[in-house]
Every structure is written in C-alpha cells, then in structure tokens.
Amino acid sequence: MPIWSGILVGVVALLAGVALGFFIARKYMMNYLQKNPPINEQMLKMMMMQMGQKPSQKKINQMMSAMNKQMK
C-alpha cells in the first residue's frame, strides 16, 4: 500500500470519527435536556411557593441572576 493511500485512509477515518462523535454528543445532550430541562422563572416561583415563601418578582430575579452567575 503506497504511503499516500495510508494517509488518506487515516484522514477519512479521523473525519468520520469526528462526525460520528458530534452526532452522538448532540443526541445525548438533546435527550439530557429533554429529561432535565433548565430551570426557569415559573419553576422557581413554584419552588418558592412550595417552601412557603411568597415569591416576589425581585426575589425571583435575584435568584435567577445568582444561578446564571454560578453557571458561568
């Protein structure tokens, strides 16, 4: 086998692995986000009500900004 065909097979295999890895990771993340959606203001409001707190918009905004800062 000439050297150029070996290099070509290696490059094709590398590209196929990258493409396959991308689609597998994308599918995994879509399933993960579907099962565990990110928290939003409505969910935060319901959690506060369940804990017996009165959810004011100011508290919700503070908690959302704190969570967003923590994620970065």
Curated annotation (Swiss-Prot):
It is found in: Cell membrane. The chain crosses the membrane at residues 3-23. The keyword Repressor does not apply. Keywords: Cell membrane, Membrane, Transmembrane, Transmembrane helix. The keyword Oxidoreductase does not apply. InterPro entries: UPF0154. GO terms for cellular component: plasma membrane. It comes from the Bacteria. HAMAP family: UPF0154. Belongs to the UPF0154 family. This is UPF0154 protein Bcer98_2334. It comes from Bacillus cytotoxicus (strain DSM 22905 / CIP 110041 / 391-98 / NVH 391-98).
